[in-house]
Amino acid sequence: IKGDAHAGVWHRQVSLLALESIERFAAAAGRTFAYGDFAENITTRGIDLLATAVFDRLSIGEVELEITQHGKKCHGDDCAIFREVGRCVMPHEGIFCRVLQGGTIKAGDSIVHQLHYLDCRIITLSDRAHQGVYEDLSGPRVRKHLEELFSGKRGRPRITMQVLPDDAEALRAALVAARDEGAALVITTGGTGIGPRDITPDVVLALA
């Protein structure tokens, strides 16, 4: 935003706060607030900012924003509202974005919320599991832990599992594909012993 103190190359270029959050805070504080009193750049209505996740996108006409942060550290006595009321809503319910595509916006413009899913891939290395000699148990176990990790959090994982033989080229191809396709997380399991076909650490380190 031209002339804004937070303009520049970093992750908090634009701040947003929902009118619904301001109204709840105003009712609890027993006073009214004007747009911008919380130093938000954009005041929204009708969109649940608290339900958004980091990496989600907000489209406002030609402008494209990527959500980078929920809330912030309270400035305490350096904040006029905190000094007056004893608390502030922005540190808890405000969100911050970086600008992916610039442009001009105006009051009354619609905001489109685009969900982002974290591409999480689990790769099991096992000749016998790949051949169907026995069932892969470690991949599903890793998936269970990932699902528990994200449970109750804003992130939205999209988890896929793959069983490969203990083959360096097959693993390398899967890792390169994950990198090129923008995967957020790749977890390998298996192939870490001392046998001649336990190649996982060497392949991963070569691509690190």
Model-derived segments and spans:
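Non-catalytic beta/alpha edge segments that cap or flank active sites
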Residues: 109-110, 114-208
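Metal-cofactor-dependent catalytic cores
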Residues: 1-116
